[in-house]
């Protein structure tokens, strides 16, 4: 139905007035504005990139990665930093926990020489630094580790045992209100690492778990990823890593509730080669005969770990199989589930 001519004139006049006050583009007709594709930063995990629906975490948005201790939250965040840097991005790490392992970050592929790092004393200081570097327009990705460690100044200055109810939640709510629009305008991705707490007095239905920092982050985050350790990886009775499951519990840019599983190897991080084998076998791109794994006419190795070692050495072959996996799954199809049974002994 056509819009009344008088209404069109009135709204056009209003748009001109708004442009004068707030700048051109403050109010636009959606039909006049080209819809831009959402850019993404790879997570370093083939399965998680597929689960997120756009090939990684979206740029210009707030992301929350949460889970129990030692589940792989920081490892995943460092992989995202490494992938961003590979494409020329500038990254910052706000280490509120004062626990960043620089040597481990380097082993995951992070360019530590060019990584901006801050170890703030208070939550207010951390969030002020975050706002300043975001408004500069020169940063592509900021990781805050973690929300639980963003301690309000009043709590630090107070005595042990003092009650500071809701201080951190108010701090987070205020910061997110200020920073969300700036992140979108500057196309900066912000990742909050968060911890899990048990709800006090929780009875009956519903999950007894919750995340720290109040409810604001749950609302402002475009993507929330729940990561858990589900098994230990062993080789010759030695623990060599963990199996992790990541579930996209909220996603504003693609369908939510998709899951991905991947190996996190001690000292190495996410095993891309392990995912290539898992998805390759599931999609019949990699052949599995007994313990032997092969691709076309080439033997990859006897056992999953040997095949992973070969793919780690032969990057060209790994890239070739990865491309075939992506083509097989397709960008518009549902994520393929991982094999029901692990290819290597886990506990």
From Swiss-Prot:
Give the matching CDD domains: RecA
Q: Which Gene3D superfamilies match?
A: P-loop containing nucleotide triphosphate hydrolases
Q: Which GO terms describe its molecular function?
A: ATP binding; ATP hydrolysis activity; ATP-dependent DNA damage sensor activity; damaged DNA binding; single-stranded DNA binding
The yes or no answer to whether the keyword Glycoprotein is present is no
Looking up InterPro entries in the UniProt record yields: AAA+_ATPase, DNA_recomb/repair_RecA, DNA_recomb/repair_RecA_CS, P-loop_NTPase, RecA-like_C, RecA-like_N, RecA_ATP-bd, RecA_C_sf
Per UniProt, subcellular location reads as: Cytoplasm
Could you list this entry's UniProt keywords, alphabetically sorted: ATP-binding, Cytoplasm, DNA damage, DNA recombination, DNA repair, DNA-binding, Nucleotide-binding, SOS response
Q: What is this protein called?
A: Protein RecA
Q: Where does ATP bind?
A: 67-74
Q: Which domain of life is it from?
A: Bacteria
A GO cellular component term found in this entry reads: cytosol
Asked whether the UniProt record includes DNA-binding among its keywords, one would answer yes
Q: Output the SUPFAM superfamilies linked to this UniProt entry.
A: P-loop containing nucleoside triphosphate hydrolases, RecA protein, C-terminal domain
The record's family statement is:
Belongs to the RecA family.
